[in-house]
Amino acid sequence: MTIEINGKQVEAYHLIMKKENALDILNGKKKVEIRAFSEKYNDLFIDKKLYKEYQKDLENPNGSTTIEDTLKDTAYIYFTNYNKTWELIVEILDIAVYQMTKEDIEVLNEDYDFHDLDNEWQQYKDLTEEEIPMFYGLGLADVVSHKGVIS
C-alpha cells in the first residue's frame, strides 16, 4: 500500500493488529512484530524477482545469497484493525527470517527484549533444519504517526 510521510508517497506494509499490541508499541514495550513464514507473508515481504535469483543461487555450491536478500526494501508498516477504527504507522528497523531455534530466540531476547517464544523452541529441537518452523521478525523503529489508538 502507499501512504504519505512528510508529504511524500511511500510504500508500507499493511498489517492487521490488536489494539493492545499497538498500545505496547506506542509505549515502547513492543519492539518487534512476529509474522508467520507463510504464503501470505512471503507474498507481502519477498521480492519475486530477487527470489528467483535466490533459487538459482541455491543450486550453486558457492552461492552466497540468503533468504533475507530477497526481502523488499519497504521502510514503513501501517498497522490497523479490521475495521480501520485506528491506525499506527511505524518505521521498520529491519526484517529478518528466524527459525524456531534456541539461538534465534536468544537473538530476539537480546535485540528486542522479546520473550513470547522463549518456551516454544524446545518442541522443535530434535527436528532437522529443514523441518524447523521459520518466521519473520520485523524490528520496529520510530512511531511516525498514530490516530485513534489512544482512546
Regions picked out by a protein language model, each given a short descriptive name:
Residues 2-151:
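Structured alpha/beta reader/binder surfaces that contact nucleic acids or chromatin modification marks
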